[in-house]
Amino acid sequence: MPNGVLEMRLVVTAPDYGAALAFYRDVLGMREIGAFSSPGGHVTILDAGRATLEIGDPGQAAYIDEVEVGRRVAGHVRVALQVGDAAAATDAAVAAGAELLAPPTETPWRSLNSRLEGPAGLQLTLFEELGPAS
């Protein structure tokens, strides 16, 4: 591939499109950058900032679940979103209908991470980078 990957899109089929759109756009603050419709449906593209693809083995996934939640809960895909204030973002997400799996918890890698079950069946980690230990 001469130019490499230029953009990553995580494409999610949401049975309740309106609720999922409102949650990710209005509650988590993802900016709408495109919207399209067909005779049978709709799609909206939201800007989630810089995207990375994190690939881990089952042992690492189990370790992260243990640190963030205390037990194995994630499926094959988990979406991690960096936010400026993990506690406030978690509260807003829960108020908007996300299920809290674990409250914001400081991790060994110096981030404050919460775990939620969000709309459209996406398990979410909301994380805030804390910076170096003082």
Predicted regions and their residues:
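Short, contiguous alpha-helical
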Residues: P119-L126
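A conserved hydrophobic helix/loop-capping motif in glycosyltransferases and polysaccharide synthases
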Residues: V11-T13
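Conserved active-site tyrosine of GNAT-family acetyltransferases
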Residues: A20-R25, A93, G121
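Vicinal oxygen chelate
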Residues: M1-R9, R31-A80, T90-E117, E129-S134
